[in-house]
């Protein structure tokens, strides 16, 4: 019986020495156990190393040797003397039990009364309880010490922890034990077990132990033949230490174990000192020897020789950092016969690098294993279960429903799910609407008209998908009504999973993943299903008969899933290990890449956080209560981790860092970098911030790795080459050989040809054949609004009307919806006026208010699921729209009463089935097109043999007419409408003349006042705010017939139209008025512009040509900008600039174009 320390610096051969000792001991003809005790995460690697000791004829000797952790040692001892029947609660069950404990004492809490409901609190308390148990601190001890403290906050905090801890212990020990209890029990049961009698025990890879583990070691020392413990320390003649000492943790462990042996009367055998001579791991590499010896030495010694085996590399970002490492690994394996297993990638922040490394290494065909446990809660199986349970509490909202539907595990085709999703989003389906017997919402969201056969069939299909989706959900939700026992809810969940064929689906997925070689993913799905079953079983065991609300059950099962992690076994022996520096366990590493070595990350800046602060821990320490170390001590221990990382390779060390993160934020190099530069002034410090385009054979060969990345490099070389031609003299012959290789490759041949062709690609598109464009646009009938869209940008028009691409409709009341609604109401109102034998001059605000209320209510109630009837919010919006329309129509009535013009028609269509025939136009190639459209309102005034026409278009926005926009084809509608009316009436006996083309604004007027105004002045301000905008004929007589208040000189500026009169009664120059001749010119120019646009469109022109003017561009609100990728900095991406000229200049330009 005795303890022997195996001491040495990192790399001195402590583990190798222990393995040699194990082999020697195994050679003896004895039957007692040989035990290698290591931390849980090291068991796999340790078993692998031990198995290699006994090959061939010696393999029988292996039977005496066991690699154990404290947990597996417990299982062996308990199997001998009892204890295995105690139900061991895992971290998942423990978290659920802690939650219940908090709930039970929630009314008694002081400091944590508000924190108890916060995210992460249960996890923090669970960790706190574990820490207390590890350090043998009972709830009673916490309660007692709280009364001795002067710090009131800490005292109350300890009382709260004690109450929760005590409640947890009471629940736990009814039927269970946890990991800490097992260690406590192990201490006593080792004495009863014969397993350790005469055993040789070797303890390796630990830096320290918890009090419970010290007690277990004490029991082991008293039972076994010998105990050997390895510790990483520097000066074995001086084991005294301070907290700032890099080896403080291991020196503390040495001191603690020595004290334990002295107290127990256990002999301490002579130490094994491995610090003599050259450190074994670095005996062939002097730089690494020097690094190990002097990195933390003060003063340090400079290594003045050339430094070849330690390198520093700087990169722009994480991606370029990892990709360069991948290239190096390919060359190491291919050119230097290095094995993948000899290479380790280590980082202090594995979460930042794991996905990136895995993706890039797979691209480079580098086998790799990410030594990181995956969270079970992110697996689709868990997401499906939680979503199914949350549906009711979250009112069957979109997020919850489609998290469930898109899990890929419910046996419904993705296309069907997407169809259902579009319909649900467009109609705002949530809550009870999901359970309507039949959904009858319109597919097209139209306010009028019959549904087509296509719409009806599609609606039937959607309802069929909905019913399939809901069938198992309805069954589950019926069972979950009210409060249930936990065991009943668990049974309902399992039955639900059977209803959707979950076991068969998972089994099928696992087979598919294995067939594709994705063993990692297959293993994850297999584990998660076992986890689901385990959690349900554990909940039944823990609280099966407890009656619980669904909300509380969801919190508990979510806590359970949060605690589970998926452990993965390396699928191959020869692979690159990717690990966090604190879990690094590849003893055969020859090439170490320490990545992401940035300030604050490595060494990690530890924060004072958690339930107990650093000051709290210090106060407890002063009272003789030992707890875990504080953040300051952790910061000092981080230096030990840096030391361990830097000394984990036997041949080559490369330290890399990026200067910016994923978001482009600046990163600074770690203090490790500056320290290395001081010790090794000749160290290679290579920067990859600016890519070197060296064309030497050596540099090119470095870029040639495996097929996919090399292909990308080849494409970049060609892409960066002279765009005017392919000059073989300037491209290195190696690249030409590579190019020829890919042209012959079975897989890459066609890809190479396509990519080379694509290098000349721009986002500019070419003309489409006329035959194809006609088949896309089909009819020769064109609406004016579509022509305006084409004038804005031919490509956007092609996407919208040629390819018929649509933005996904979501359940909201958008400006276009408002415009459609307003037009529909105004059309209905105007027609009902005629049915009531009334004119605009006969009605007052009371009539308007009543009629609008009836019309709006009819529309809202007529359409199933109409948004304005969907909620109190939207019902209030409908109420406001009634008021707005009442006000706007009252203004329209006043505008009409103010003049002599009478509305003669509404929603006037010109087209094949319209009141007026379409406008026919013959193009240069002889093709005839028909222009169709719809006029909101036509007003008329007759005087003698003259008739004057006024075209009105209703707009919810504040729009006016611009001659510049007419010139460029962006505002054609009103002039085309005017032209259509004038042309259709030219055969009448009267002279038909244009009077105006105007936009009538339908909106709530917002008038600003600087002082109090009376009612008449307020009314005048409202009329002015809603005054129509557009172009009026420059004829003072006709102007006065549109606003009679101008006749007697009562006012100079009209409140109806955008015109003012001068003192002598003429139309003012600064108003929106043009002559009859100019109106005639505009009509002629518009025909000319339309003809040009039609010819261009039907010729197949779909170029990306958005316009730009002082107010913005046509790209500003375009739904298709992500498709065209227009960028004015790219060649050939130019805006069509609309030159802002005066009306006189525009008129002159128009004359030049039409003559």
Curated annotation (Swiss-Prot):
GO molecular function term, any single one: ATP binding
InterPro entries: ADDB_N, DNA_helicase_suAddB, P-loop_NTPase, PDDEXK-like_dom_sf, PDDEXK_AddAB-type
Alphabetic keyword roster: 4Fe-4S, ATP-binding, DNA damage, DNA repair, DNA-binding, Exonuclease, Helicase, Hydrolase, Iron, Iron-sulfur, Metal-binding, Nuclease, Nucleotide-binding
Taxonomy, superkingdom: Bacteria
Residues holding [4Fe-4S] cluster: 793, 1115, 1118, 1124
EC category name: hydrolase
Positions with a binding annotation for ATP: 8-15
Signal peptide bounds: none
Cofactor note: Binds 1 [4Fe-4S] cluster.
Family: Belongs to the helicase family. AddB/RexB type 1 subfamily.
Role, per record: The heterodimer acts as both an ATP-dependent DNA helicase and an ATP-dependent, dual-direction single-stranded exonuclease. Recognizes the chi site generating a DNA molecule suitable for the initiation of homologous recombination. The AddB subunit has 5' -> 3' nuclease activity but not helicase activity.
Protein name (record): ATP-dependent helicase/deoxyribonuclease subunit B
Lineage, broadest ranks: Bacteria, Bacillati, Bacillota, Clostridia, Peptostreptococcales
């Amino acid at each position: 019986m005795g303890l022997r320390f195996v001491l040495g610096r990192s790399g001195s051969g402590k583990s190798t020495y222990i393995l040699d000792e194990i082999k020697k001991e195994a050679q003896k003809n004895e039957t007692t156990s040989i035990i290698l005790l290591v931390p849980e995460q090291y068991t796999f690697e340790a078993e692998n190393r031990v198995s290699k000791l006994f090959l061939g004829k010696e393999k029988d000797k292996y039977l005496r040797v066991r690699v154990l952790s404290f947990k597996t040692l417990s299982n062996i001892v308990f199997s001998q003397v009892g204890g295995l029947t105690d139900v061991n609660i895992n971290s998942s069950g423990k978290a659920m039990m802690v939650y219940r404990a908090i709930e039970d004492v929630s009314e008694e809490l002081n400091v944590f009364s508000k924190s108890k409901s916060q995210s992460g609190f249960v996890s923090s308390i669970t960790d706190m309880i574990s820490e207390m148990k590890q350090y043998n601190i009972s709830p009673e001890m916490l309660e007692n010490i709280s009364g001795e403290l002067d710090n009131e906050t800490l005292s109350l905090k300890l009382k709260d922890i004690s109450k929760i801890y005590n409640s947890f212990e009471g629940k736990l020990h009814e039927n269970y034990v946890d990991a800490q209890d097992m260690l406590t029990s192990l201490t006593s049961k080792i004495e009863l077990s014969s397993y350790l009698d005469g055993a040789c025990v070797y303890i390796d890879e630990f830096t320290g132990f918890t009090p419970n583990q010290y007690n277990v070691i004490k029991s082991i020392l008293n039972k076994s033949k010998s105990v050997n413990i390895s510790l990483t320390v520097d000066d074995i003649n001086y084991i005294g230490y301070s907290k700032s000492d890099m080896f403080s943790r291991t020196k503390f462990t040495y001191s603690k174990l020595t004290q334990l042996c002295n107290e127990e009367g256990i002999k301490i055998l002579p130490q094994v000192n491995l610090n003599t001579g050259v450190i074994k791991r670095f005996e062939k590499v002097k730089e690494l020897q020097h690094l190990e010896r002097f990195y933390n030495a003060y003063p340090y010694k400079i290594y003045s020789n050339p430094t070849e085996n330690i390198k520093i590399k700087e990169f722009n970002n994480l991606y370029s950092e990892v990709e360069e490492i991948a290239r190096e690994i390919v060359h190491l394996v291919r050119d230097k016969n290095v094995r993948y297993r000899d290479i380790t990638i280590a980082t202090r922040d594995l979460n930042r690098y794991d996905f990136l490394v895995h993706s890039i290494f797979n691209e480079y065909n580098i086998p790799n294993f990410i030594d990181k446990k995956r969270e079970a809660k992110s697996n689709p199986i868990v997401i499906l279960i939680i979503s199914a349970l949350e549906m009711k509490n979250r009112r069957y909202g979109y997020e919850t429903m489609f998290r469930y539907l898109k899990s890929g595990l419910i046996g419904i085709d993705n296309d069907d799910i997407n169809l259902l999703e579009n319909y649900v989003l467009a109609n705002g389906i949530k809550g009870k609407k999901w359970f309507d017997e039949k959904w009858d919402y319109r597919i097209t969201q139209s306010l009028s008209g019959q549904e087509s056969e296509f719409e009806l069939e599609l609606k039937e299909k959607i309802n069929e998908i909905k019913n399939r989706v809901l069938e198992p959900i309805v069954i589950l939700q019926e069972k979950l009504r009210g409060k249930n026992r936990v065991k009943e809810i668990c049974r309902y969940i399992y039955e639900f999973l059977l209803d959707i064929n979950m076991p068969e689906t998972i089994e099928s997925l696992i087979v598919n993943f294995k067939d594709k070689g994705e063993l990692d993913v297959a293993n994850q799905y297999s584990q998660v299903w076992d986890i689901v079953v385990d959690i349900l079983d554990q909940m039944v065991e823990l609280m099966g008969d407890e009656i619980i609300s669904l909300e509380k059950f969801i919190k508990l099962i979510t806590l359970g899933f949060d605690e589970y992690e998926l452990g993965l076994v390396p699928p191959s022996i020869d692979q690159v290990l990717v690990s966090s520096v604190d879990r690094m366990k590849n003893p055969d590493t020859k090439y170490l890449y320490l990545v992401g070595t940035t300030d604050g990350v490595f060494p990690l800046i530890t924060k004072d956080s958690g339930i107990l602060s650093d000051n709290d821990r210090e106060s407890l320490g002063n009272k003789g209560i030992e707890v875990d170390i504080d953040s300051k001590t952790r910061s000092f221990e981080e230096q030990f981790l840096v030391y361990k990382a830097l000394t984990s390779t036997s041949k080559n060390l490369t330290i890399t860092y990026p200067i910016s993160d994923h978001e482009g934020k600046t990163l600074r190099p770690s203090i490790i970098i500056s320290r290395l530069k001081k010790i090794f002034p000749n160290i290679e410090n290579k920067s990859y911030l600016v890519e070197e385009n060296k064309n030497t054979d050596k540099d090119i060969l470095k870029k040639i790795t495996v097929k996919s990345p090399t292909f990308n490099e080849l494409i970049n070389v060609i892409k960066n080459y002279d765009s005017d031609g392919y000059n073989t003299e300037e491209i290195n012959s190696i690249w030409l050989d590579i190019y020829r290789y890919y042209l012959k490759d079975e897989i890459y041949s066609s890809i190479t040809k396509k990519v080379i062709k694509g290098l000349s690609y721009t986002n500019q598109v070419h003309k489409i054949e006329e035959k194809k464009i006609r088949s896309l646009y089909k009819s020769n009938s064109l609406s004016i609004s579509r022509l305006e869209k084409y004038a804005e940008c031919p490509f956007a028009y092609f996407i919208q009307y040629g390819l018929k691409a649509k933005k996904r409709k979501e359940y909201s009341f958008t400006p276009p919806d408002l415009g459609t609604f307003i037009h529909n109401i105004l059309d209905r109102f105007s027609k009902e006026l005629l049915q009531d034998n009334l004119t605009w001059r006969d009605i007052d605000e009371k009539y308007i208010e009543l009629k609008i209320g009836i019309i709006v209510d009819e529309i809202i109630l007529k359409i199933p699921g109409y948004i304005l009837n969907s909620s109190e919010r939207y019902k209030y919006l409908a109420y406001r729209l009634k008021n707005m329309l009442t006000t706007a129509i009252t203004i329209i009535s006043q505008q009409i009463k103010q003049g002599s013009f009478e509305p003669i028609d509404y929603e006037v269509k010109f087209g094949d089935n319209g009141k007026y025939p379409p406008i026919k136009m013959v193009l240069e190639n002889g093709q005839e097109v028909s222009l169709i459209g719809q006029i909101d309102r036509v007003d008329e005034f007759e005087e003698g043999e003259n008739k004057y026409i006024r075209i009105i278009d209703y707009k919810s926005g504040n729009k006016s007419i611009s001659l510049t926009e007419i010139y460029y084809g962006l505002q054609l509608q009103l002039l085309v409408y005017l032209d259509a009316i004038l042309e259709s009436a030219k055969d009448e006996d009267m002279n038909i003349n244009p009077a105006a083309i105007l936009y009538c604004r339908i909106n709530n007027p917002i008038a600003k006042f600087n002082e109090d105004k009376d009612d008449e002045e307020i009314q005048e301000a409202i009329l002015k705010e809603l005054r129509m905008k557009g172009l009026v004929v420059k004829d003072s007589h006709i102007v006065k017939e549109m606003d009679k208040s101008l006749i007697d000189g009562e006012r100079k500026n009209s409140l109806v139209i955008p015109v003012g009169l001068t003192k002598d009664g003429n139309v003012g120059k600064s108003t929106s008025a043009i002559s009859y001749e100019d109106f005639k010119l505009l009509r002629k120019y518009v025909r000319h512009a339309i003809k040009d646009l039609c010819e261009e469109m039907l010729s197949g022109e779909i170029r990306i040509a958005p316009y730009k003017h002082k107010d913005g561009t046509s790209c500003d609100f375009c739904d298709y900008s992500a498709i065209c990728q227009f960028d004015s900095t790219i060649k050939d991406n130019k805006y069509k600039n609309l030159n802002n000229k005066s009306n006189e200049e525009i008129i002159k330009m128009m004359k030049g174009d039409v003559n």
